[in-house]
Amino acid sequence: IGAYTVDYNGSTLTFLDTPGHAIFTEMRARGADVTDIVVLVVAANDGIMPQTREAIAHSKAAGKTIIVAINKCDLPAADPVKTKSGLMEEGLVPTDFGGDVECVEVSALTGAGIDDLLGLLVLQSEVLELQANPKANCRASIIEARVEPGTGSSATAIVESGTIRVGMPFICGPYAGKVRALVNDHGERVKKVGPGMPVEITGFSETPNVGDELVEMENERAAKKLGEERQEELRKQRLAQPRKARMEELLAMMGDGTQKAQLKILLKGDVQGSVEAIRKAV
């Protein structure tokens, strides 16, 4: 998932860019969970695809407002009306068809309609009264994680409430940490980042899992104590799972009288999201 900000008429919009390929299902689901407004990009020459239906389902399940960007309207084969008809079959009725779903015809190639889309996003955010308290206890959602040579584990996160600061103790999943450095979406080192903004964080004791929530703690001691408690709970769960799995495998082999060969695979990728997608494909 890519995260970046766009300034438009005095407002700052944060975009989460999720891949459209079929194997990136989990990424799209996480994107729908974290975001406030879903921009559903549909190609005017392709219409409704399986991934489109999936993205609509994720967005509806997360209870998010959907704005449809009908892209590639510059192509001769573009048919926005047919695309809108397809959206109606999925339960999304465009405003010009008497519904409440805003649709904007755009072209990523020529830039046509992009201003209209950005303006609509700003307007919708005002209608929804999207607000966050920068003075609240900091919470951030991990949208990508990796191990960087020389800096160790780092993660990209969206700050959902409060303000994340360098030196802040936190808990993320089962591990405690302390913010060592913050880098904004322009690659600049910063001291703090407020709500709704993407940020790259270093200072994790272990690589966090995508989807984990980072929560500000009162001090490092409290973070470490909570981390140890969560790790112990995970250890107990891991010890219980193998015995159950072995019993299920044994019963399965006894049932059909055959023993199936198992091929163990070690997957490595640049970020957790890539590994997740490859695992799904395999």
PLM segments and residue spans:
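Switch I (G2) and immediately adjacent beta-strands of P-loop GTPase domains
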Residues: 1-37, 44, 58-60, 144-145, ...
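Active-site phosphate-binding and catalytic loops of NTP-dependent enzymes
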Residues: 11, 24, 49, 89-99, ...
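Conserved Switch II/interswitch segment of TRAFAC-class P-loop GTPases
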Residues: 11-12, 22, 33-53, 61-81, ...
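Residue-level signature of catalytic and energy-coupling elements of molecular machines
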Residues: 15-17, 39, 52, 59, ...
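G-domain G4 guanine-recognition motif of GTPases
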Residues: 43-44, 67-79, 104-112, 145, ...
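Switch/connector loops and helix/strand junctions flanking conserved nucleotide-binding motifs
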Residues: 49-50, 75-82, 112-116, 179, ...
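C-terminal effector/interaction modules appended to NTPase cores
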Residues: 61, 149-282
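Canonical P-loop GTPase G-domain recognition
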Residues: 74-135, 200, 215
